[in-house]
């Protein structure tokens, strides 16, 4: 079953799905600044575009481009700066 999610007044949209017990979402973020909280550990992969992120326990910002991934701890948060519309895959690691 697919689950459609919408955040930040429609500027971030994703479709959640499950495959062989693994949960993931694929989505698109419009240009903007966002902050997400995590319940479980996540791996974010940039499909097209770029995401500049700051993890909750870090001072520095890092940019990830097409094909690159970063992990976010569970019960944490991360900030994003998106300069152009960007597609992503979010895999839940629990």
Swiss-Prot record:
The keyword Endoplasmic reticulum is annotated on this UniProt entry: no
InterPro entries with a match to the protein in the record: Ppnp (IPR009664), RmlC-like_jellyroll (IPR014710), RmlC_Cupin_sf (IPR011051)
Swiss-Prot/TrEMBL catalytic activity: a purine D-ribonucleoside + phosphate = a purine nucleobase + alpha-D-ribose 1-phosphate; adenosine + phosphate = alpha-D-ribose 1-phosphate + adenine; cytidine + phosphate = cytosine + alpha-D-ribose 1-phosphate; guanosine + phosphate = alpha-D-ribose 1-phosphate + guanine
Enzyme Commission number(s) of this protein: 2.4.2.1, 2.4.2.2
UniProt xrefs under Pfam families: Ppnp
Coiled coil stretches, renumbered: none
CDD domains: cupin_PpnP-like (cd20296)
GO cellular component, one term: cytosol
Gene3D superfamilies: Jelly Rolls
Broad enzyme group: transferase
Keyword Transferase: yes
GO MF: guanosine phosphorylase activity; purine-nucleoside phosphorylase activity; thymidine phosphorylase activity; uridine phosphorylase activity
Keywords assigned by UniProt, alphabetized: Glycosyltransferase, Transferase
HAMAP family: Nucleos_phosphorylase_PpnP
The family this protein is said to belong to: Belongs to the nucleoside phosphorylase PpnP family.
PANTHER family in UniProt: PYRIMIDINE/PURINE NUCLEOSIDE PHOSPHORYLASE, PYRIMIDINE_PURINE NUCLEOSIDE PHOSPHORYLASE
The protein's role, per its UniProt record: Catalyzes the phosphorolysis of diverse nucleosides, yielding D-ribose 1-phosphate and the respective free bases. Can use uridine, adenosine, guanosine, cytidine, thymidine, inosine and xanthosine as substrates. Also catalyzes the reverse reactions.
Name of the protein in question: Pyrimidine/purine nucleoside phosphorylase
């Amino acid at each position: 079953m697919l689950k459609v999610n919408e955040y930040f007044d429609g500027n971030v949209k994703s479709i959640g799905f499950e495959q062989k017990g693994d949960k993931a979402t694929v989505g698109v973020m419009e240009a903007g600044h966002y902050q997400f909280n995590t319940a479980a550990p996540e791996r974010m992969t940039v499909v097209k575009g770029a995401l500049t992120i700051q993890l909750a326990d870090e001072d520095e910002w890092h940019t990830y481009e097409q094909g690159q991934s970063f992990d976010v701890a569970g019960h944490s948060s991360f900030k994003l700066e998106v300069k152009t519309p960007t597609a992503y895959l979010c895999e839940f690691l629990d």
